[in-house]
Amino acid sequence: MSKIASVDAPSFSFLFDGKKSSDLLPQWSGKVRTRSLDSLRQQETTTWTDRTSGLEVRCVAVRYSDFPAIEWTVYLKNTSHKDTPIVENFQAMESSFPCPESDDFVLHHNVGSPADGNDYRPIETSMTANTKLHFGGAGGRPTNSDMSYFNFAWGNQGKIVVVGWPGQWAADFTRVGSRELAIRAGQEQTHFKLHPGEEVRTPLMVVMNWQGDWIKGQNQWRRWMMAHGMPKPGGKLPTPMLLASSGRAYGEMIGANEANQIMHIDRYLEEGLKLDYWWMDAGWYVQNQGWPQVGTWEVDRKRFPKGFKPISDHGHAKGVKTLVWFEPERVAANTWISDNHPEWLLSPLSGLESRRSTQLGIPEPCVVFNRNDHAIDYNGIHWDAKSIAFHPGPKGEYSVVRFTAPKEGTYKVRGVFQGIDNLTTTDVHIFVNGKSVFDSFIQLEGLGKRVEADHTVELRNGEVCDFVVGNGNGNYAYDSTGLQATLTGPDGIAHDAAKEYGARDVAWTYGYLTPGKVPNSETFRPYDQINKDAAGSNSLFNLGNPVAWKWLVEHVDKLLIDNGIDLYRQDFNIDPLSFWRGNDAPDRQGITENKHIVGYLAYWDELRKRHPNMLIDSCASGGRRNDLETMRRSVPLWRSDYAYEPIGHQCMTYGISMWLPFHGTGTVADETAPYYGGGVTPIHSYAFWSNAAPSLGSGIDIREKGIDYPKLRKLIANWRTLGSYYYGDYYPLTPCTRQDDNWIAWQFDRPEKNDGVVQAFRRPKSPDSQIRLKLRGLLPEARYRISVLEGASDRDGKEVSGKELAEVGLPVNLVEQPGAAVIRYAKVGPV
């Protein structure tokens, strides 16, 4: 491909000790080193060093000779023997570009993978003068909400900008006036000092220019991905693959064992369904609470006495490889890792101490204290540094912070109750010796999130003052309430609940009151359990910990080898952001995330180095980690946890194909199939083709011999024919909508071979039995022969000119409602 537009230069920014990098770098010593990576890639490394602080800035850029594209990553390293000043707002890209003074300026972008049927939905946003747009990761997973791939189009040209960061990225696009586009992108939160020898990096940025229409830009991107942005095990791009598992029938792998896995493989082959991979998903390891209890990464020898090797050997002997699921980053309680190496784990609530009752046996009611010198934000709750909060129980238990008077006299009581959850709605009280002196509400009865009380009371030695939180409107959820409580005694000493928290020989105790219409101090029962880190059931394996990282590499590598595993599948069913940020000090914000991301990418690079022919499958509750850095190392074989439903998956193929040439999903060939289940299910062509993708996983219950296997064999044979076209140029032929009274269609075209394929779907309530589809990428003067794989049989064998197919359109007739058509075309000669 020839160079069709000038390539941009890297542009990044940060503040260092309050000064702009754009002002600092010209003053620092710099050098440039250029080297050829291969015949198509030139690497340019520019380094600046501040001799005063020892901060080294290194920008590593790669320019491509076969595409008008550039990529870069920026690294910061402390080369001194002392901490650096603060680095903040470390942006991988901060740049602006001239654009025409026209309203014809559009951003093409896509939804991420929220698993709600809107996954990968394409969006077209007009960027008129002064438009400001913000995109980013959600919860620390990069494509939870937004895809991190963007195409700006104006006139007959445009620019693709892609952020590669498997964490919490953020991007802001601003049309400054009408003649400039400003772009700012990077890790969302950075404010840190670097320790001696420490290094961090930005997200990977890719900028690609294109000319023509925006779809041409998308296809230029697809070709770049295939050339430079996808894994190539054994030096080759992944080929379309048919996989199968028994997960629907056995609750993932909970009900699986050696015998039934071998039986399932044999049954597929018995029915003439040649598999590329046998897929063994979650639940194969030691656990006693179901598949989510991950953290003991050993094959359950009760069900698999010799591990997976007998299954792998059996499959290999019959030409079937094995895929096995892992989820190393999430660690559940009561597992080998959590019990033996808690120092390898991150809690989102590190430093948050919780007091609760073992008699109740539940997390709430409780009193919580943030021991940290910094605030903690988690799931919408904000704990100030060195602060107390409390929470009622699910059955109406009141939570109490109790003061016991050390001497007789007059006490000044001050209480401040603050809702610290976004949705706190509760009642609060102050009781003295069982009698109320203050009753109020948080965000109920017209009151706000904060109420205050000041009283003067008489207390004898040993008498009590209770600060109480209830469940307000009868719903205890979200009722985390901050408390500032102070009693100043007759001696002038101020007893502060937060400052004296947990100290011996002081006046404060913590407990709960039994449920009732009003608090009854006589029912006070002290909390008898202290949790130093109030973590939930899951922790995050810290891939930024070198010791933990080394153990994981060696352990997983051994599992792969010993069990004959051919394809490594990694899931990620947890939002890591609160774990990262909960472990950052105020002057180290962003460091935990950065080190985890670097460790994650290095972990995969090491596995790929040790297993050069092995493909990696990236899953994160479906497709929630499909950023470019991840996609360079893996493919998403399960693109969404929204499974099987035809219309949603039609739209997914439509949207994701704009950016990722290879992706996968599963099928039962039945639009009514539940996520889990077994038994005989019908084989519907419409459902099958709606879920067809470059990688296709079968979820049918192969134990059942009453399934229509002849029909399924034909569908799979035709799908394998279709598979050869997925790496062609992609053209959407209709708008993308989830309405059930429409058609949807797209085209994959191979210009090098002058052929292609069209897929079209008539949805259940579409009143039209025919649609005309104007094809793209054809030679007007050429003649094309039509061949039908599915539906629209009236077109089979016809020959049509490229001009007619492009200008008049290919007529597709479907009597079936719903129905699917798969139509090939190939050049046979001139008109």
For each feature predicted by the language model, list its residue ranges.
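Short, acidic/polar linear motifs in exposed loop/turn regions
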Residues: T79-K82, D421, P764, L779
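Short Pro-Gly-centered flexible turn/kink motifs
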Residues: F192-Q211, P818-Y825
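Gly-Asp-aromatic-enriched flexible segments
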Residues: E353-G516
